[in-house]
Amino acid sequence: MKIRAGFNLGYECMQPTPMLLVLNIHPSRRADLLSDQILTFDQPIEAWSYTDVFGNACSRIVAPPGRTTISTEFEIYDSGQPDIVPDDAVQHAINDLPDDVLVFLLGSRYCDTDRLADFAWARFSSTPLGWARVQAICDFVHDHITFDYLKADVLRTAHGGFTDKAGVCRDFAHLAIALCRCMNIPARYCTGYLGDIGVPIDPNPMDFSAWFEVFLGGHWHTVDARHNTPRIGRILMGTGRDATDVAMSTAFGPATLSRFEVTTEEVPQEAGKAD
């Protein structure tokens, strides 16, 4: 299947403002592109591309005073298959984990494991190791937090989501990640596109989505505590310890987001053609 995705973002700056952007698709999905995915600017801006320590495709710019619009639109191939559920994936002993995975066991800005460890062990220590434990954590978070756009809070941590019991997709992800790490399961934050493909249309405006991945059986596996069901058509943009590492923009100076439009939709198949 084909998916068309993109965005239009507007920023208002009072002075030249350096910015870091994580707005490209993840390098692991480049081979699936059916058209170029290029960031365009409505101002004469030079962008420098680089790969961060987590392997994300990032950009550096200096936004001029006034309004700057950043946009992209592309088509990408997707298998059309839902997320894989690795029922038999085993949990590694700490000493068997690859070196580059260990960082995803540690607490981070939004995943405050030290405040959740006692609860996590009391609640999940009796569950089977491996995927069954991840699913138990996912089930808990899905039932514990109520999704509410009006309760979004960029300062809320995993423990904040635990106590507030409300939030948006990043809050589901942060709490689930923190609980997994408490139980010695490496977990990392993911951001990207997730359209209403194969599910009822959400009447709310489209947004970027957040989910997470766990390292079991030698591989990273997709998990979504907000929806708690395999979904179709994820397009990964970035991975990191938490939302800090994959913020769509980080401005080193005053910058106001004045426009935010995200699109993700399946491209109708032409009659007589198959993907």
Role assignments for model-derived ranges:
Residues M1-A89:
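Intrinsically disordered, low-complexity N-terminal segments that are enriched in acidic
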Residues C13, I76-G80, P86, D96-G167, ...:
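Secondary-structure boundary elements
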Residues N24-H26, P86-N95, R226-P230, F252-P254:
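Short intrinsically disordered coil segments
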Residues P44-A47, I94-L97, P230-T239:
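Short, surface-exposed linear segments at secondary-structure transitions and domain or protein termini
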Residues G66, T127, I201-P203:
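Glycine-centered loop/turn motifs
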Residues D139, D171-R259:
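Hydrophobic/aromatic-rich core segments of domains that either
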Residues G195-I197, A271-A274:
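Intrinsically disordered, low-complexity linkers and terminal tails enriched in Pro/Gly
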Residues G238, A274-D275:
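Hydrophobic helices that insert into or interface with lipid environments
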